[in-house]
Amino acid sequence: MNREKLMKMANTVRTGGKGTVRRKKKAVHKTTTTDDKRLQSTLKRVGVNSIPAIEEVNIFKDDVVIQFINPKVQASIAANTWVVSGTPQTKKLQDILPQIISQLGPDNLDNLKKLAEQFQKQAPGAGDVPATIQEEDDDDDVPDLVVGETFETPATEEAPKAAAS
């Protein structure tokens, strides 16, 4: 194509200014405020009440803790619904454990012991050896292997005895 033809075509395709083609459909940007308004209206129908003076919420999931500092907490006990709003921070359980020990009551001491056992099992090196020993102790039906012996030798010795009887 000629350079002159390209220049003419470029002039017809303008991005703005007088005589440009308008968009037929307006782009709709969905914002989070509309979602929040819908959620709040649904929560009003459920009948949630705001719970004031909550400084911290920790949600435990696997080995991760989702922590909310100064959240907005709403609850509906009749609907078994709890809403925690705020900015979450994801932390490892090991990092947050020293802070929450003082908050745990006597009921949760058993849970704390279970968590400590899990950490010992997951610890590299020393934690792996006791776990394998426990697994070996659980297998009472399986005989232990002895160096130099196979299971075939006792089986071949017992076969002639059984045939002789």
UniProtKB/Swiss-Prot annotation:
Species of provenance: Arabidopsis thaliana (Mouse-ear cress)
Keyword NADP: no
Acidic residues bias locations: 134-143
Family assignment from sequence similarity: Belongs to the NAC-beta family.
Compositionally skewed regions (Low complexity) per UniProt: 144-165
Classification via CDD domains: NAC_BTF3 (cd22055)
Subunit description: Part of the nascent polypeptide-associated complex (NAC).
Protein name, as recorded: Nascent polypeptide-associated complex subunit beta
Record GO terms (molecular function): mRNA binding
Every NAC-A/B domain range: 33-97
Region Disordered: start-end pairs: 120-165
Keywords: Transcription, Transcription regulation
InterPro entries linked to this entry: BTF3 (IPR039370), NAC_A/B_dom_sf (IPR038187), Nas_poly-pep-assoc_cplx_dom (IPR002715)
Keyword Cell membrane: no
